[in-house]
Amino acid sequence: MKLAPDLLQATFEQTFSILQQARRSFSPQLQPREIGTITSIATGIAKVSGLPGVGFEEILKFPSDIFGIAFNVDEDEIGAVLLGDYWHLQAGDEVERCGHLVDVPVGEGLLGRIINPIGEPLDGKGRLIASARLPIERPSPAIMNRAPVSVPLQTGIKVIDALIPVGLGQRELILGDRQTGKTAIAVDTILNQRDKNVLCVYCAIGQRASGVAKVIATLHEQGALEYTVVVVTEGNDPPGLAYIAPYAATSIAEYFMQQGRNVLIVYDDLTHHARAYRELSLLLRRPPGREAFPGDIFYIHSRLLERATHLSPNLGGGSLTALPIIETEAQDISAYIPTNLISITDGQIYLSPSLFELGVLPAIDVGKSVSRVGGKAQRAAYRAVASNLKLAYAQFEELETFASFGARLDDSTLKTIDHGRRIRACLKQAESTPISMIEQIAVLLALTANLFDEVPLDVMSQAEHAVRAATADIPVEITARLASTEKLTDEDRDGILQPVRDALAPFMHSQKRKEIT
């Protein structure tokens, strides 16, 4: 079948018209790309040339979707920190600028998830559902945007809530030698936030995989994982991931804080973070200082911990409470990193190996521990019993040391030592068993009223459990007043102590004072 000349002409004209229209409307989306080249690779870092426009801490893309951070920016060469498995990279590979800083996904979808510092899921539950992405490096709130620490954060640990109180927005350092229970205190605090409208972020920095797995299993078994985000870097991860981990975790926590929520973040631990930064700095040939740490080691921790605060009401009133953990060596709390963190934070909880060896858990040395701002947030009921308790415990520790030399002691001193031993026994607490506020106050009030003094030491644990069980008989109106800011009245004391006396009656005995030799 042959087409008529007129029809063929019309078809050509229509086709040419469409092509001309498409040509006029076409606007090529040209995107300039700046490509550099790897010149050398070392453990966790790479030297890159050919990227004259790169900025400090800008993300660089390496082959196989490996990312790095521009850490040293020189005129001719870039020192990049690698954030993934870099063993397949080699000199001569291409490197591309990404044009933005490191960011991390944030949002409600991260609750209950386990991720690494660049937002990749590690729990096998599929991709993350994020509300937004925030840079990991963010400025801390201005002074005028901060509110004083005025609301308590219950840890569920008797000795902390009574003698070393922590408030919302506070930064309380936990430090001690290896295997003294530092992580256990932080995890118990997370467990105690259940049904208290406090979200949690647990950041494991360069930890053993078995240790992190144990923490995650505890959170899961106790139902705490549902309100917790876990950010993990293991000991075999590149040092770059360990370096950015606490900053990424803080951005995740800040998202909730800016929505008016209360958030608790645990850094476990900043000793590994400091060592990772030292390793990167030495590999990048930055000048070393004390203990081979770079000169800005104080600044990297201060800018991190200054992001923890209590926002003013006009910004939503949210809070970010930080519990950084530091590992000491041979009980030396005057070392470089511990003293840096002590000066940055609002107090410290020191765990003593000596107490740990005696079976006093948590092994908190009350004399070396302090909370500089938490006392202002402590409930009045705690303040009514804490001051006398701390003084009595301090006297006991001093006299116990004196008695160890074999001196003959009078009856008054023996009584003080006996009372102190019962204070120590009552302050013991098993791991993963946070105690409610009313139960804590009942036990502490019984201590200050000397009700435990006639209870044998070998049944102190059973007697304490009986006191805690007896709190169910305390009138509801007294319990409500204890939870508020009202002071503890004499009527309230009597209402609490009456069921406590009844609970302790089966354990009472007339104990004969023994001479301590």
UniProtKB/Swiss-Prot annotation:
GO terms for cellular component: plasma membrane; proton-transporting ATP synthase complex. It is a peripheral membrane protein. It is found in: Cell inner membrane. InterPro entries: Alt_ATP_synth_F1_asu, ATP_synth_asu-like_sf, ATP_synth_asu_C, ATP_synth_asu_C_sf, ATP_synth_F1_a_nt-bd_dom, ATP_synth_F1_asu, ATPase_a/bsu_AS, ATPase_F1/V1/A1_a/bsu_N. The keyword Ion transport applies. It is an enzyme of class 7 (translocase). The record marks S369 as: Required for activity. One of its GO terms (molecular function) is ATP binding. SUPFAM superfamilies: C-terminal domain of alpha and beta subunits of F1 ATP synthase, N-terminal domain of alpha and beta subunits of F1 ATP synthase, P-loop containing nucleoside triphosphate hydrolases. ATP binds at G176, D177, R178, Q179, T180, G181, K182, T183. The keyword Nucleus does not apply. Keywords: ATP synthesis, ATP-binding, Cell inner membrane, Cell membrane, CF(1), Hydrogen ion transport, Ion transport, Membrane, Nucleotide-binding, Translocase, Transport. Its EC number is 7.1.2.2. It catalyses: ATP + H2O + 4 H(+)(in) = ADP + phosphate + 5 H(+)(out). Produces ATP from ADP in the presence of a proton gradient across the membrane. The alpha chain is a regulatory subunit. F-type ATPases have 2 components, CF(1) - the catalytic core - and CF(0) - the membrane proton channel. CF(1) has five subunits: alpha(3), beta(3), gamma(1), delta(1), epsilon(1). CF(0) has three main subunits: a(1), b(2) and c(9-12). The alpha and beta chains form an alternating ring which encloses part of the gamma chain. CF(1) is attached to CF(0) by a central stalk formed by the gamma and epsilon chains, while a peripheral stalk is formed by the delta and b chains. Belongs to the ATPase alpha/beta chains family. This is ATP synthase subunit alpha 1. It comes from Shewanella frigidimarina (strain NCIMB 400).
